[in-house]
Amino acid sequence: MTAPAPEWTRRAPVDLPGPEGDNSIARESLWYAYGRGDDRPEPPPWTWASTPPPDSHVPPGPPRPAGPSRVLPTGTTDRLSALAYPRVPAAGPAAPDALLHALAATFGPVRREPENPYNEHRPYASPRCLFPVHAFVGDGAAWRLLEPARHALTGPDTEAPTRIALTGRYTAIPVAYQWFRGSLVSIELGMVLRALSLGLELFGVPATLTPPSGGGAGPLRELGLERTWEWSLPWFVDVAGPGPVARAGRDAPVPAGDPSLTHVVRVDREQTYPAGPAPLTTAVPAGLPDGPVVPDWAELLWRRHSGRMPRALHGMDSAPRPAPVPARHLAAALAWLGVPPPHPVLAAAFDAVTVTAVVQHVEGYPAGVHRFERGAAHLRKADPTAPAGLEANYGYGLSPVNGCGIAKAPLTVFFSVRPRELFARFGPTGWGAAQLACGWAVHGLCLAAAAAGLFARPVRAFKEIPTKEVIGLAEDETIVLSAVVGVPRETGGDQLDLRT
């Protein structure tokens, strides 16, 4: 970004000068500083640093440990096809290969879309299909890398796997995202956590979840990751009871030339969860009715997508719909949003999240701004112009190379927090906990949309200050995450099935 002229008028406690004042990437670190008590946070010097364009970014190669590559079992899709949606199998002894099938159901590529500028697509969303969150699978002594594209586990031979470590790689995201890389990793960790919870649940594998406990980068070195500054501290999922507490260790220094990443790593290491392991609870709301669109879980995961455009165009479009969206689809979305994250700290952080939605063309609901609370939608302001107002304040508007269907979308959902309240209740841990909780919730919304024959696109590109005016948020609230729920447009493009 270009440094602005020195004189400017601050519109809110968190603001930047010049045309970049609504840039969500640049605003993120200011909200963190505001939460910690700075009433008028100033942008750090690296805000104005010149960075390569995102499209020039080449992600680093997989962090493969030494050792053989073992192919995962096939047949996961057939097993999911035999599970009627929305039913979840009753608890019982899991098959010997159940964990491996759950991993394939969570992380395995679903399809490739040749006309889409970003590929491949998994059961959960990821910006630019970068998938910065990696899974390592171990037996308590050694670890192997899960390589979804190769449908394999790579690394030293181990006993039967009992532990999964989830960690996000900051350097998988273009450096142009600067401090925002930390937020993208935390949000995607929440999405992955729900996707994995669902996979384990569908294959009958109970588990516990252990959050990072502080103490430094020792857990990353146990995974074989010596460049610890590239990675977030891992969350552990155990299928044979909670595993051992990882030893402490110091981080390797961040190389010169990326000052924002130094701050990202410091913030991640400050987020120390006070509670220990907790059961991995359900990812699926109870009492969902049978859906007329998807007969089984394989079809649901196939239908999840973020909106498509033809001819390699970017963005998304929401097609016209002759009849309103049935009320039952919004009721199901509310049910999915109401399932709390599995760990007590995450669940408490999600209680601090406000969910606001702009609704239109949905049976039984007036067009306007609604607040989603306790499984119900409460009208805050009748406003048929709100969808157009949102599109006008979206960072990637309609253009010859970009689609933008927000003005036509039946539902756009916003997850917001008050950073001061988060820090007062949880300390620095609240920042990441709220982001994980919002990622968990939005993946549920994505699945609800797929079950209704709709798409859901998680986004962070709304211009925050004018968007908050449209949906009625206070100046001390920040938008953690949004999702546009629209009607899929038929593009005529191929969808290559990559499932196993």
Language-model segments: what does each one mean?
Residues 1-438, 444, 451-500:
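N-terminal accessory segments that position/regulate proteins before the catalytic core
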